Amino acid sequence: MKTNYLLILFALLLAIPQAADAKKQKDIAIHLYSVRDLINNGTALHVVLKNLAQMGYTSIEAANYDNGKFYGKTPEEFKNAVEKAGMKVLSSHCSRGLSDKEVASGDFSESLKWWDQSIAAHKAAGMKYIVNPGIGVPKTMKEMKMYCDYFNEIGKRCQQNGMKFGYHNHAHEFQKVENQAVMLDYMIENTNPEYVFFQMDVYWIVRGQHSPVDYFNKYPGRFTVLHIKDDKEIGDSGMVGFDAIFRNAKVAGVKHIVAEIEGYSCPVEESVKKSLDYLLDAPFVKASYSK
């Protein structure tokens, strides 16, 4: 009897760390802009990716697309590097603004040629989402309407290639264009949900003196991907209100969360690890939002 008791106790002790590890397995992507200093200072990409995977990040969002390549690598090479490190390719920030000539003429067909090439490269890299990282405040309502039409067309082409297109906000989108319409609201209301989603950067919404949850309720289902960001390390400032954000993720339509650490109070490696640990330990952050 005593032997059986000891065996059971030993089995329970073995299960404790496994259970703890299981609790900390969450689908959390990282925006590679967060580690730009490491990459720009010459640290090999495969080393950076491996370290991120070992920390517990499960996928990446690229931030360095240029002329058919990601961080100097072909789409296939980049995809292989990410997967070899033990992560998945999720999304990429990529943009081409309209020229003054295109705005004046109302014809953005030339830019769409660029997008066709970019979409092909992103598809080859295994991307699920392409996100425009932001545009400036349009000078006129006509220009803003044109950008919505432009984004709808890009989104349609992404959809035809098995991807989705989104727009990432900052705080300036709360400005009114020609004193008529709030830029962010107008863009959400004048883009087709079938073609365009919004990657809400929760930090910039708060910095713009608005509530992410209010926007979730105002435009339910439009925020497929969230950028989880803070002033520096995630969770440190106390200003963003992550608890309420995550508890209302369902109404927002969230499928993925992407950590972005733009500023640091410690070395980059420590900063991105500390930010991830906050999300892994937070009871209000689910293991996955895509299921």
Residue ranges and their predicted role:
Residues M1-Y5:
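Positively charged n-region of N-terminal signal peptides that target proteins for export
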Residues L7, A20-K128, D277, D281-K291:
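N-terminal pre-domain/capping segments
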Residues L7-A15:
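Bacterial N-terminal signal peptides
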Residues K26-H31, I60-A62, V89-C94, I130-N132, ...:
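Hydrophobic faces of well-ordered beta-strands that scaffold small-molecule active sites
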Residues R36-G42, A62-T74, R96-L112, G136-K145, ...:
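Acidic-and-aromatic substrate-binding clefts and catalytic sites of carbohydrate-active enzymes
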Residues S59-I60, Q159-F246:
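Acidic/histidine-rich catalytic cores of soluble enzymes
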Residues D100-F197, E269, Y289:
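Active-site acidic/histidine proton-transfer and metal-coordination neighborhood
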Residues S237, N248-A249, V254, E262-K291:
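Aromatic-rich peripheral "rim/lid" segments of glycoside hydrolase catalytic domains that contact
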